[in-house]
Every structure is written in C-alpha cells, then in structure tokens.
C-alpha cells in the first residue's frame, strides 16, 4: 500500500496521457495559449487571422477575443502533458512550461527535469516519497530509468564522482520558502544511506548518524519563522561531505555564511527569533529553569512578539530532539549546559533597563536584577559589568579615562553584546560539529558539496543583511548562467565544433559590479568601507556618495518621490529591491564595548571565556567614537593590524565559496515557491512565471535542445560501446578518434545527432540514453546466449550420467537374472561349496602378498598424503602471500599515482623556486655582508654594555666606601665651606650643561615626533597605494573579461584555430592562478614589511637611547677616572685571581670537551635508532641544561672573585683612611659624590630602560629564532616526505622502465603528431606574444582611462563653476520680468514639443516592443521548427537504420535458411544412412532370428539327446552340464541381440519424427520470409521518398550557411584591421613605460648613493668618537698621576716644616744651655751632629720637592696639551655632527624631491612602482628567509647524510633478506620438483599395476578361449556318438577311463571355465 501511495506522487498516469479524445480535440480546434491576467495563460482555439491580429475563442467560457499574433503561443499535443523532462516539449514557450509544471503540481508531481537541471515546487505538505524503500529504488539507477526526484540528482552526482573522480556540488537555489533546506536534508539522507560503510539497514555508522543529526542542531540555532517560511534558514551553509576511493563517507565539514544575528534582539511582526529560544523555554524542566533563571515568554524584551507558535510543531518535543542530536554529535553535558546558559544570558541582556538622569544625559541603571542574572549566568562580576556599560574606560591619547554613557549608547552596547555573544556561540557550535564530523583518519579522495544559502529576499524595506543575501544570490545565478550558457558554448568552440555563439542576455555582471566593484567607480560595499574610514560620516553621507558615484548605473535607481522611505533601489535579476541605509555603517563595522569583552574573556565560566578568547581583534566603541574627532586611520587599528569590516569579510568568504564551486561539477536544483500564503495545492502562475524567467529555465531548456549536452571522452566511448560494433575496429593499435569515427559509422547515427571534437564525442540530448539501452539489450542477449550454452552443457552432462546409469542398471539386471537361474542348480551349489575349500591355501598366500602390498601402498599413501598436506599448506601460504602482494601492488599503484601527481607539483614548485633562487643569489652576498656588519655592531654594543656593567659595579663599591667615610667627614664640613662655594659654582656650570642636554633631548623628541608623523603619512600613502592596487586589479579583471569576449568573437570567426584557443584558455587559467598566488604573496609581503618597519623604528629608538646612554656614561667615566688610581694598586691581586679564573676556565673547557665527546658517542648511537629527531631533541635539551649548569658554576666563580675583589678594595679603603693628609680632599670628594649619586640614579634609570629595551629585542630575537626553528622543522618534514617520494619515484621509475619497452612501438606513430604539435606550438608562441602585446596595450589603456578620469573630474569642477555662474545669471535675470514671460512661453512650447516627442517615443517603444515580441516569437517558432527538423531527421535516420537492420536481418535469415537447408540435407543424409543401417540391422535381425530358430531346434534336439543320455548313462552327465552352459550363453547372446534391435528401432523412429518436424518448420519459415520481404519493400520505397525531400531541404540550408560564412569572413577582416591599430597603440605605450622605468632606475641609483654617503659619515663619526674616548681616558690617567704627585709634594712640605721646627727648638735649647759646663759640650756636639743630619735630610727633601715640582709642571703641560687635543677633537666631532645634520637635511630634501617625483610619476605609473617596491621588499624578506633556511638546510643535509647511511644499511639488510627469500624459494621449487617426481613415479607404478591387470585379463580371455575349444570338442564328440553304436563304445570307455584318470586340477580348470562362462 505504501509503495502504491508513493507511486502516485512519482509516476505519471499513462491513461491520462494516451487519451485519443484529447488528441483529436487538440487537432480539430487548433488550440493555442493566450495571455490571461488570472492564470497567466489560458487555452483558446484559433478561429481567424486578420492582419497582425487574430480572433480566438476561449475554451473556458466560449468568448471570442481579438489578440495580437505576437502574444499567441503554440500548445503542445496532449501526449506531452506532465512530461518528465521539459526539453522533450515540441513547442517550447513560457505557457507550455507553466502548464506542464502546473499540471504536474496539481497531480502531486513536484519534481520535473528542465534539461540538465531539476525544478522543484514546494508542496507545503508531507509526501510519502522519501522513505528507505524509495532510496533503494533510486540507488544505482540511471536518470532516464526513474521518474524525476532529488534522489536521482544526488545519485548522478555520486556516480559521476566515483567514475570521473571529479568533485561534485549540488546547488539548491531559489527564493525564501521554496524548499531549499528540506531538499538539502534529503540529499544528505540519501548520501548517508548510499555511501555508508555499514551496509546493514539496522546498524548505521556513527559518522552517518552524526551527519544526519548536524542539520537539526544547526536548524535549532540558525533557523527561524518568517512571513514567507516557517523554517527559514537565517544563515547560509556549504556542507562538504568527503568520500574515500571506495565511495564511503569519511568525514564532513560545514562552512556558514552571514548569520542574521540582529534577529536575536528584535523581530518583525508575526515572526520569531531563532528556534532554540522557544525550544528552551518550552522544553526545560523545573530544575533546569531554576538553574538557568528562566522566565515566561512575555517577560523577555528580546522576544518581540512573545510566544509565536508554528502549526504542526511542538517546541517541547523539538527541545528533546535537539538535546538528543547534541548527545549523538558527542557534545558533552558541560558544553551543552554552557550553551544553554549563554542563551539564557542573551535573553536576560534584553531585560536590562536604562534611564536618563534628570539634569544630565548620563544613563543610569535603576534596577540591576537583570544585570545580576546576566553576570551569574556568564560568570562575571556585577559591579565591573555595570561600570563597563555605564562608565567604560576609554583611551584618550596615552591615558585611560572613564566616560559616562548616554541611555542610547548603553542600549546600543547591550544589544551589540547580545548579538556578538550569540554569533560567537553559533560559530563555536559549527566548529564543534566540524570537529565531530572530521575525526576519522581515513583519507578523503573527493567530495560532494551541498549549498543551502538564504534565498532571494524582497521586503517592503530591505537592510544591509538583505543586500548581502541578494548579492550572494546574484553571484550564484551568475555561476549558473556562466556554466549553463557560456562555458557550454566555449567548450564547443574549444573542441572545434561548428557552433554559432548564442547570447541569451542573462549576464548579471553589471549588478554584481554595482555591489562589489572596488573602484572606477567604486561599488556600494567599497563606498561603505570607505565611508567607515571618514570622520563624522553618517548613513546619509553614505547614501549621497552612492548616488553621486553610481547615479547613472543602469541597475541603480534613486527613489522617484520624496515620500518614499527607501534611500536607493537596485534592479536585481529577481526584481527591483528598495534599500533603507539605516545603521549601515555600524552594521558594517560591528563595534563592541571592549571593557565588557575583556571582562567576558576573564569570565570564571570556561565556556564563556573560550567564546571571547580573541578579544584583541574586536573594534571598540571608543574607536567608533573617535571617528567624529580624528581623521587618522590609525584610530581603527587594533593590536594585530587593521580591522576588517563585515562587508569585506563576507566578500572574501563568498569569493572563496565561488572558487570552490567553480572547481566542482555543479548540479543545479531550482526551488520554486508556488504561493506566499504557504497553502498546499495552490499555484500562483504569475509568481511562478517570474521565478522561471529569473532562473533562466527556458534558456536552459533551449541550449539543452540545440546543443550537445552529453559528451564522452574517446577512450571511454570506445571502451563502453565497442560491444555494439564488434567487427568495426580492426585489430592492432588505432587512435581513439579514428576508432570512435569507425564506431559511429557502424552505429549508423545521423550526423546531426553528434559532433566529434578534439578529445570528446558530443551527443544531442537522449542519444546517449538510446545507446545505453542498446548496450543493455546487447549485454542481455550475450548473457542469454551464455546461459543457454551453460544450460546445454549441464543438460548434456546430466544426459550422459543418465545413460551411464541405464547401462549399469542393465548390467545389474543381467547378472541378477543369471544368478537366479544358477541359484537352484545342484551342481552350482556343490561348486560354490567346494571351490572355497580348494582356494583356501592359495588365498592365504595371496592374502599375505596382498597384505604386504597393502602395507606398502598404505605407506606410500601416507607419504603422498603428507606431501599433499604439505603442498596444500604451501599452496595456502603462497596464495596468502599472493593476495598480500596483490594488495601491496594495488596500494603501490595508488601511491605511485599520487606520487606522480606530487612529483609533478614538486617539479613545478622546484622550477619556480630555482628561478627565485637565481634571482636572489646576487643579493645574498650583499645581505650576508650587511648581516656581518650588524653582528659586528651588536658585538660592539655588547662590549660597551659589559664595560658599563663593570663600571656600575665599581660605582657600587665606591658608594659603600664613601658612605663609611661620610661619618668621619661630617665634623670637618665646616672647614670646607669655601670649597663648597667653589663646588656650587661648578654645580651651576653642570646645571647649564644639563639644560643644554635637555634641549638636545627635546630636539631629538621633536625629530622623533616628526618621524612618527612621517611614518603615519607613509601608512596613509600605503593605504592609498593598496586601494589603488585593488582598483587596478578590478580594472584588470574587467579588461580580462573584455578580452575574453573579444577572443570569443575571434573564435567564432577562426574555426580552424580552435586548438590554439584551447591552449590560450589554459594559459589564462594558469595566469589567473599565478595572479592569485602573487596577490597572496603581496599580502604576506605587506604584512612582513609592516613588521619590518615597526622593528626598524624600535631599533632606531633603541639605538638613539643607547647613544644617549653612551654619552651619559662617558660623562660619568670622566668623573669616575679619579677613583682608578686606587684600583691600580689592587691590579696585582686581580691578576692572581684572574689566574685562578683561567684555571677554572680550563676546567670548564675540559668539561665542555667531555660533553662534546659524550655528544659524539650519542650521535653514533643515534645512527642505530630509527627515530632520529626525538633523540636528537632530547640530547640537545640535556646538552643545553649542562651548559646552563656550567654557566651557573662559572658565574658563581666570577661572583666569588668579585667578592674577593671587593674585600681587597675595602682593605685598601681602610689603609687610605689612615692618611690624614687627604681629609681636605675628601670633603671635596663628598660633594662630588652627591653629584655622582644623582647622575648615577639617572644613569641607573636609563640603564633599566635600556635593559628593558634589550629584553624586548631579545624577545623578538627569540621569536625570530622560534620561527626559524619551526621553518627548519617544516623543512625536515618536507625532506622526509621528499625522501619518501623519491623512494616511490625510484619504484615508479623501475616500473616506467618496463613500460618504455611497450612505448617504443608507439613512438614511431607519435613522430608525425609531434611534428604537427611543434607547428601548433609555434603558432601558440606567436599568439602568446600577441597576447602579451595586448596586455601591455591594456595597461596603457588603463593609464589613458585614468588620465581621462582626471580630465573628467577637472571638467566636472569647471561645470560646477559654470553652474555657479549660471545661478548668478539667473539672479540677474529675475530683474527682467518681460524676458521671463517670453522664456515661459518658450518653455511651454518646448514642453509641448517634449510631450509630442515623448508620445512619439512611447509609440516607437511600443512598436519596438511589438517587433521584439514578434522577433522572439519567430525565434521560438524557428527553434521549434529546428527541433521538429531534428526530430524528422532523427526519424529518417532511425528508419534508415531500421531499413539497414531489416536488410541485415534478411541477410541473416537467408544465411539461417541456408544453414537450415544444409541441416536438412544433412538430416536427410543421416536418415538415409540410418535407413540403410536399419535395413541392414533388419536383415541381421532376420538372420539372427533364423539362427535363433535353428538354435532352438538344436536346443530341443540337445535336450532330447540329454534326456536320452541321462536316462541311459550317468557318465555323460558332465558333458550334458557343459552343453547346458553353452546353451545358456547362446540364450544370453540372443537376448542381447534383441535389445540392440529394439534400440535401433527406437532411433529410427526418432530420426523419422525429426525429419517431419524439419520439413514443417521449413515451409513455415519460407512463408514468413515472403510476407516480411513484401512489407519491407513497401517501407523502403516510402523512406526513399522522404530522404529525397530531406536532401533538398538540407541543400537549401547549406546555401544559407555559405552566405553566413562569407559575412563572417568580412567581419573577421575588419577585426584584424582593428587589431593592427591596437598593436600600434601598444607600441607607443611600451615606449612611454620604458622611459618611466629609466627615470625610476636613475632615482634608485641616486638613493643608493645617498645611502652610501650616509654610511660613510656614520663610520667616520664612530671613528672620531672612539679617538675622543681614548684621548679622554689618557687625560684622566694623567690627571690621576698629577693628583698623586701633588699629594707627595704636600707630604714633603709637611716633613720640611717639622724638621725646621725641630731645628729651631734645638737652637733655643743650645742658647739656653750655653752657660752650663763642659757636661753640655758633648750634648752640644751630639745635637750639632743631629742638626747636620737633619739639614742633610732637609736638602734632600728640597731636592725631592724640586723634582716633584718639575714633574708637576710637566704634568700640567701634558694636561694642557691633552685639553687642546680634546678641544680639537670636540670641534672635529661638532663639525662631523654638523656635516651629518647637513647630510640628513640633504637626505630629507632628496626624499621630498623623490616624493614629488613619485607623485608626478605615480599618476601614470603607480602600478609599476608599487609592484617594484613590493618585489624589492619581498626579495629582501625572501633573502632573510633564504639565509636562515640555508643554515637550516646545511644541518638538514648532515642529518640527511646520516639518514642516507642508515637507509643504505637497511637496503643492504633487505637485499640479504631478499637473497634469503630467493634461496628459500629455490629450495621450495626443488622440493616441488621432487614431489612431482614422486608423483610421476607413483603414476608409473599405477600404470604398471594397470598393465599387470590387463595381462591377467588377457590370460583370463585365453582361458575362456580354451574352454570354448573344449566345448567345441565336446559337441563334435556328441555328433560322433549320434552316428553309430560301435564306435560309441570305445570312446565311452576312453571317456570313462579318462574320467577316472582325470586329475583335480583339470576338474578345477573346467569349473573355472564354466564359472567364467556363467559370469559372461
């Protein structure tokens, strides 16, 4: 019953179609179609034609109406009603197509073929045509075998993917509500059933289940109820289902496009938001509601219309289904709960209410319960959330400020947050589904893509979302038109088929350009993006700009009245659409509150934080607010580069999708909406007609009918249909094309039904299906014949078996009858009893011998069985190995094919890379030198940093020492106040110097700001250049399209050069691919350039800061040189410690040597291990750890040495403290220390900054190193893959070497074709040069176009000025009223004239429309007539075929009759032979009967005689017994003869019956042949007449074609003249370009010279600075020596004073003690001696002081000289600095000049300069990469060499294994040979046994013959006995005596003979 119900909605009712009454009515009434307002078209009968009008009678009401002839359309015969393929209609027009679709729709047939695609009308009800049984019905069937269905389309796509190995796509297109989503689901259902790896119906695979469950999840979250559709997809999706080589599903991937996220916050009237919101609120349990804080429907603001229900759907049940689908998809419960929390959070966001405060515009949140719920659900802090919305932190300059938000801003922020949250959740869900669907490890070979995207939408007012959706549908419709109409016809021309290009007028490119064109003039999306950049831009300004730029576009319209709400209109292919541009700028930028975004990123809920992980890519509201304040594009820059608008992202996504679809074979399904009321069984004809016109259905049918939609490659055609032409192709090699020509000749196809191209055979619609049917019939015939042979063979076998059984039965019967006769005979019984006794002894011996033989035989049998089992096991092993080898071979072949492809790609890549390498090798050396120079500078900087660190450490120690001394010096500060005043003066001087330095720093900062402004201006220029590049690319594309059109026209004319055009198209495709690659590379290059610029600026900043630090450090060094005197004394201790340090270093080097040795050992071990990478990495890590440990030890030792140094310094300080003479100087030093401490604090601050910058540089360096390592890893992986590929290549090479032998025979045939190819290549080269010239010309045209555009702008400006002048003149004209009146009269006259002209124009337009209609009608009629003509030709060709087939049949029948005659003659001859045999057998039988009668008579005589003998004598018993035996034998012979006679009689009867049958059949066949011959003769005469008519018609057509060709030749000549003019233009443009390039090269050379001069000045400056530093160091050392000398002089002066004091004291004592006595004389002498001694000492000290003074003077002189030198060096440095500044100024001036030059050149040559700059940057970047990669490559080469050694070792091992296997195989073969020999010996023994058996049989036969001879003797004796009595006695006695003398052996022998006789 279910099947019958389904058939009703699938198959057409044949009784309705074949109604003869309807056919007669149609023919009688001349029915036609007439336009109708109600039903589109209605039937009417044509009554009368009057001029251009016709009178028709409407069928419905019988009214007569006058109609224009052009409006009448022909009606098809009733047999074409509800036709499955509308391409079969005889009259193809809108009315017929609409009627066919309507009839089928009302009958429940929703699917109809329309040529190559399928049309589906939404039934708005469930139909029983999608069950598993229906799927099985369509599985593997051809399209024409089953009625139209979505399953049929899917199955053809699947089968063509499997056969052609080409990716497929199924595009379901149509308006919203047409049924695209449902058909997509059915496609997935069919594929999941057909391509499932689990073949049982009950057990479906997990992947297939998940694939089927992906749609319900996506529908729940992405679909919604709209006015047109209850389950409208509010996003687009492209489902890619991947299949493996066997056709099983291995995975899937879903890509989504443009989710309508605004539906989450507001909906139109009677519409719903996304289904999941209603599912959750209806289906959630109480526990879940409390957890998710759910409320009733009317409590949510975001549910605009409350609870809107969908008829026939329960939201509660759908919730359970969605949750079950997520469970099947493998989404865990935690993630499910996370999704539901986010949904509830989105709803709660709508409930947050803001109010405006009284006095200010600031927003406030009076009730924060909703905010608390939101923060609870999303895991964030409430206060932070409310603060982030009401008073977010906004960046102003470099600071962050909290800005209060207005109510409108807060509401916008909440809505934006809700939309973004839902969109991110949806994107996460799609990624999660893709992860689940793509988890299989099997490799996907090809895929089927299913596109389900939002249909065309036309509302009252349409927004940005509708523009994107309609733009997508325009692109898809353009793809359909391109594939159906343009690519189809281009393929005809490529293949060299005679074809006139038909322009169907369905090009949608103008509308697409209006939306997407980037420049010249820019499209709507480009203008929207541009407006987003401008400050104070509004939606109104955007609309004004659109009207200004695109106001004159044919597809663009302004609103006609001011009352219209729409801002502008676009004429799409589906109709005119009004757009309202409210909030388009915001929608395009899609801004967010970045405070809330960061808060959500830091959420405690893992799911929410995962959704908001890419916070750094969003556009903040502060950036959008900045639009009104700043004009800089930098305001829109995020952390990772410039932001991308929604329009840009969607455009890129769409371009990617279109590229994917173009690379597949598309299968179109056109979905049609029958009505807007969503009612079943209702069809609005006007709505359907509009959709048919838009979708290009009629044009698709027309090209399908006129063109050749079916095409087959030569080889495939030969392989598939050679069975239909078995003997047409000769044996041996033949070209595919020649073979196809011969096959088509043999098939006798009409020449109009096919065309033979260069590589394919093209057929009209239906021809291939007919061939397929014939092929199926042929195959069935072959299989029937094969079955008949098999059945005959089996029957013969069974018959032979039955015959054997019959003969066996007869033998058994005979033996049984003989046994029954002998059973009751007494002698037999005695014989049976005696015989075993006699044979016992003999049997025992025989048994012994037999047992021995049996034992031997059994042993042999066991041995043979063992051998057999061994052989079987060996065979099974060999079979298994064979299977394994076959599998490996198959895998290897597949791998080989893949490797071939890979090899081709790699070779192409290799060639490209080699070219790039050759280009870059010249610059590598320069870059290496530059790198070395930079490394040297880096080393210098590191050395400077180390020196600074050491000085800082010394400062630290000095500071500690001074702090200790500070306590002792505080008491003496009062004495040093005068010195303090001096120091204050010095401080003032230092302050002045500090101010000077600060001024210099300010100058540097201003320079830095200027540089930043320059960088910004450069960024602006870069953006402009990028925009210009995009414009030029768009123009290039447009020019390419124009060039393609020119080439198409040229292809029409140049029919002979089709092959060359094919190759040009291929080259263009390659160029397009290269351009795409170039664009990608340029994008990467620009990104890299941006990074390089940033790094360069950072580097310059760092260098500037380092220079400042160096200058400050040099100043500090001058102050610190005074402390170095104390350090010189500690140098000895330091040397000792240095020796210890060197010892430690030697120890460290020893340890390093040991580690190196360990590493070598490890590397040797690693060679033996298979996985080299892991072990190497582990060893590297351990090695690094050891190095770090050694470094730590080294640093510890250094620290210990530093501590010891510090201790020595402290000792030295304590010793110096003892010197009291230095107290005055210490005070001075204390003051200096204060200054130094301040300076040191500043230096430490700067040092920290420098260290931070250094760390940043190191981080960048580490990042670069990481990138390099990643690249190295990739290179290693590629190297491994290359090695694998090389291994596979070697295998493939070995195979190819085998194949070369086969190809050698073909090479001779290929030489001729190669010569032709060379000629074609030459022509191609010439064409390619022409093509290049055309491209150059195109570029020049572009430049001219730009100049013209500039001129146009200038003219527009002039026009504006003129308009202003006109307005002024109008004001003046207002004074003259009289003039106005005359002007008004003139105006009225002009208006009247204009009205008259308008009327005339309208009349002309109407006439033109009429002419167009007549033209279209006539064209359609012409097409119909052509179709009829084709049909008639086909019928004629079919009749000719039938005639030829009839002739063939007749010939076959004649041959069959001849065969039958021969068979009859043979049968008659056999019958005669059998008759003669029968007669001879009858004679033989008569003779046998006679013999039998004689034998019976003799038998009777013998019986009587026996009785007599028995009665008379007992002695003769034995002889009587023998006679009875002979009698029985004779009786048996007689019976055998009888049976033979009966058999012969049966055979004779059978032959007679067969003879009669043959005669009857022959007579019947003769009569049938005569009748058929008469009928065929009549048909052939009629066909000949028809053919003559057709030939005449064809001749007329041929003449028309000749005329057209002559016209085409004239047009071709004109085009060639135009081409020459264009070439002249190209030459001039090339000259201009060369001049520009020369100027550019000159500028570049000047730039290089400037750069070199700058480098020289820098080097000289650095040398001067180094000399100045050295001089300063010398001066400081001299100053230190001078101070030391001054200290020594002071000490000497003190000693001198002490000595003088002592002398004075002694003199006083002498004077006082002069009056004492002689006792004091001795004391006096002693004292005088002491004085003399002291005087000597004083003289010595004076000499010393003089020497010291001399030295001091010398030191002062040296200091003065050093100061003069220093001043000279400073003046030199100043001069150099001035020179540098002057050079920088010159450089700036040159840069300005260069920019001016570039500005002048850019107007003409922008594209070339940008390309060159991009190439330079790209090459520099590539050079850096190459240097890095070269270093990595060296390492990889070493690794690869090691691997190669390992591989060689493995190869040697495998060779040994192979040799072992060969030895084993040889042993097995020898063993097999031995077994064979043993078998042969056994067979010989069997033959010997058979020979012995035969010998025994011969002996037995001899014995029987002797027995017969004895019987004969007995019979002769009997005869003699009968003759007389006397002689009878003697023999009787003799016989008695003989009987007495007879031995037992003779008796036994006689008995044996009798037994043998009986056995016979």
Curated annotation (Swiss-Prot):
Any one cellular-component term (Gene Ontology): cortical granule
Modified positions (N6-acetyllysine) are 8, 102, 299, 435, 613, 860, 975, 1024, 1234, 1249, 1357, 1392, 1404, 1410, 1459, 1638, 1793, 1802, 1845
What would you give as a GO molecular function for this chain, any one?
A: protein homodimerization activity
> Predominant location of this chain?
cytoplasm
Signal peptide span per the entry?
none
**Annotated region (Mediates interaction with LIMCH1), positions in chain:** 2-838
Q: Which positions does UniProt annotate for ATP binding?
A: 174-181
Domain (Myosin N-terminal SH3-like): give its ranges: 27-77
- Modification sites for Phosphotyrosine: 11, 754
Q: Which SMART domains match?
A: IQ (SM00015), MYSc (SM00242)
Where in or outside the cell is it found? Cytoplasm, Cytoskeleton; Cytoplasm, Cell cortex; Cytoplasmic vesicle, Secretory vesicle, Cortical granule
Region Actin-binding: start-end pairs: 654-676
Q: What is one GO biological process annotated to this record?
A: negative regulation of actin filament severing
Q: Where does this protein have compositionally biased stretches of type Basic and acidic residues? A: 1122-1137, 1948-1960
Post-translational modification remark = ISGylated. Ubiquitination.
Keywords in UniProt for this one? Acetylation, Actin-binding, ATP-binding, Calmodulin-binding, Cell adhesion, Cell shape, Coiled coil, Cytoplasm, Cytoplasmic vesicle, Cytoskeleton, Methylation, Motor protein, Myosin, Nucleotide-binding, Phosphoprotein, Ubl conjugation
| All residue ranges annotated as the Myosin motor domain in the record | 81-776
Q: Which PANTHER family match?
A: MYOSIN HEAVY CHAIN, NON-MUSCLE, MYOSIN-9
Write out the function statement from the record.
Cellular myosin that appears to play a role in cytokinesis, cell shape, and specialized functions such as secretion and capping. Required for cortical actin clearance prior to oocyte exocytosis. Promotes cell motility in conjunction with S100A4. During cell spreading, plays an important role in cytoskeleton reorganization, focal contact formation (in the margins but not the central part of spreading cells), and lamellipodial retraction; this function is mechanically antagonized by MYH10.
Query: Which family is this protein grouped under?
Result: Belongs to the TRAFAC class myosin-kinesin ATPase superfamily. Myosin family.
This one is known as Myosin-9
Q: What is the lineage of its organism?
A: Eukaryota, Metazoa, Chordata, Craniata, Vertebrata
